[in-house]
């Protein structure tokens, strides 16, 4: 183990000088040795500047760092604990416990920088994963072992949707889950912990947090730490759920680090290596012949612009995209999923079956026609429409309302008990609306309910 000294500190960027014959490799973890708050601070090598000097990023607060401090090279990249000892625990980017429940007691540690599985090891699946959320199961069904993105601007419900998915899938799913909190609010991490504890599934979840208040190094690497833990479970032959909230903050941390390292920015100020960094992470989130990783990732959309380089780069890696819309949220329809913008590779008659495909297609066709007619209605009113178009509008408004659903995780705020709707009931309900079986029911009866049976019950009560 070679030792060096700190020669320059600029915020989270620390330059360390080593003897010429013992220069650390890129991604090696270095440790500060000294008095005060910086003792034990981990630095990750990013660049070799020549002359024995390496440029590193601090994986913690750099307060109190000064020139001349001794630095020891660990000789390997950052490692995190893996295996069953991590379940039920909250850890930071370095795999250190932050839940005040004693040491992790792991039997094994893995380095966080690993190569993605080779083509021959990977396996794809067409098995559907039922979420119990009508709009998702119908329009953008998830695949077991697939990658799903929840796209949305600020305050349209990404985290609430993710919490509901965790609630519905993690509880019903007998496998294990890993939750990586990347640059999100500490309060949400806290809420998640108690949500899991109250529902009795805490012993099946490993949590890794690098929240908003932490330096960019932590936020850039915490997704890799969480993924490494998930990979270990997958390689043991288990089916793992990986939740990442939020992928955009991972990109943002990369932008901060890139600027600190003095790289020339590219489009909209993002790092020039944006596509590569995203690829390194996303290519590792995959299923192999041994086990599967099903991942759900929240993606913040800056200024509601889906063409922004960060969400646009993420799109390419996903099997299903759930787009949350501010316009739909403003109508009071939650989950605010846009059925016309959301897509899934699984929505194919060979995978979901002809009936499901036809109903989903029918719903999208009716909603698209309603969208086109809105301008005519705004100028001329409903009376100028043909009878056929009037029927389309009435059915579209019912479909729009029927796409809303009370969530289990939002019971406290809404006062309505949460509803889980099976795929069979979802298809039956929307098929009935498209066929005109419920044309006689008022559209208010379709709002915030579970299955179509509840709509009929609600309509009968109002009579």
From Swiss-Prot:
It comes from Shewanella baltica (strain OS155 / ATCC BAA-1091). InterPro entries: AAA+_ATPase, ATP-synt_VA_C, ATP_synth_F1_bsu, ATPase_a/bsu_AS, ATPase_alpha/beta_chains, ATPase_F1/V1/A1_a/bsu_N, ATPase_F1/V1/A1_a/bsu_N_sf, ATPase_F1/V1/A1_a/bsu_nucl-bd. Its EC number is 7.1.2.2. HAMAP family: ATP_synth_beta_bact. It catalyses: ATP + H2O + 4 H(+)(in) = ADP + phosphate + 5 H(+)(out). Produces ATP from ADP in the presence of a proton gradient across the membrane. The catalytic sites are hosted primarily by the beta subunits. This is ATP synthase subunit beta. Keywords: ATP synthesis, ATP-binding, Cell inner membrane, Cell membrane, CF(1), Hydrogen ion transport, Ion transport, Membrane, Nucleotide-binding, Translocase, Transport. It is found in: Cell inner membrane. GO terms for molecular function: ATP binding; ATP hydrolysis activity; proton-transporting ATP synthase activity, rotational mechanism. F-type ATPases have 2 components, CF(1) - the catalytic core - and CF(0) - the membrane proton channel. CF(1) has five subunits: alpha(3), beta(3), gamma(1), delta(1), epsilon(1). CF(0) has three main subunits: a(1), b(2) and c(9-12). The alpha and beta chains form an alternating ring which encloses part of the gamma chain. CF(1) is attached to CF(0) by a central stalk formed by the gamma and epsilon chains, while a peripheral stalk is formed by the delta and b chains. It holds the Pfam family ATP-synt_ab. It is an enzyme of class 7 (translocase). The keyword Nucleotide-binding applies. Belongs to the ATPase alpha/beta chains family.
């Amino acid at each position: 183990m070679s030792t060096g000294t700190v020669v320059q500190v600029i915020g989270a960027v620390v330059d360390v000088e080593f003897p010429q014959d013992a220069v650390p490799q890129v991604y090696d973890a270095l440790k500060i040795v000294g008095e005060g708050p910086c003792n034990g601070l981990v630095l990750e090598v990013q660049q070799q500047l020549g002359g024995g000097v390496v440029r590193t990023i601090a994986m913690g607060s750099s307060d109190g760092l000064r020139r001349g401090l001794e630095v020891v090279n660990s000789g390997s990249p950052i490692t995190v604990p893996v295996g069953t000892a991590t379940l039920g625990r909250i850890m930071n980017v370095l795999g250190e416990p932050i839940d005040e429940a004693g040491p992790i007691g792991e039997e094994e540690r893995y380095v966080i920088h690993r190569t993605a599985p080779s083509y021959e090891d990977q396996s794809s699946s067409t098995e559907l994963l039922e979420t119990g959320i009508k709009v998702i199961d119908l329009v953008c069904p998830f695949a077991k072992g697939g990658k799903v993105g929840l796209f949305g601007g600020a305050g349209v419900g990404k985290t609430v949707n993710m919490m509901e998915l965790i609630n519905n899938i993690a509880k019903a799913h007998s496998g294990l889950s890993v939750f990586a909190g990347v640059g999100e609010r500490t309060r949400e991490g806290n809420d998640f912990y108690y949500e899991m504890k109250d529902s009795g599934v805490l012993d099946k979840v490993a949590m890794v947090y690098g929240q908003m208040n932490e330096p960019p190094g932590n936020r850039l690497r915490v997704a890799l730490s969480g993924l490494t833990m998930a990979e270990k479970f997958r390689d043991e032959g288990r089916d793992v759920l990986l939740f990442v909230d939020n992928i955009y903050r991972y990109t943002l941390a990369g932008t901060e680090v890139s600027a600190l390292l003095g790289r020339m920015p590219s489009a909209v100020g993002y790092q020039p290596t944006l596509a590569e960094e995203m690829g390194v992470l996303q290519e590792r989130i995959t299923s192999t012949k041994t086990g599967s990783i099903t991942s759900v990732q929240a993606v913040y959309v800056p200024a509601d612009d889906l063409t922004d380089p960060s969400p646009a780069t993420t799109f390419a890696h996903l099997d299903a995209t759930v787009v949350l819309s501010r316009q739909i949220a403003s109508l009071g329809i939650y989950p605010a999923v846009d059925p016309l913008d959301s897509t899934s590779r699984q929505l194919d008659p060979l995978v979901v079956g002809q009936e499901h495909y036809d109903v989903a297609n029918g719903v999208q066709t009716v909603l698209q026609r309603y969208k086109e007619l809105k301008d005519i209605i705004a100028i001329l009113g409903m009376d100028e429409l043909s009878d056929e178009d009037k029927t389309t509008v009435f059915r579209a408004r019912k479909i729009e309302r029927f796409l809303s659903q009370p969530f289990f995780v939002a019971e406290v705020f809404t006062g309505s008990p949460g509803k889980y709707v099976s795929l069979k009931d979802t298809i039956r309900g929307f098929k009935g609306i498209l066929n005109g079986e419920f044309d006689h029911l008022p559209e208010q009866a379709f709002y915030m309910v579970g299955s179509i049976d509840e709509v009929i019950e609600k309509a009968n009560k109002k009579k």
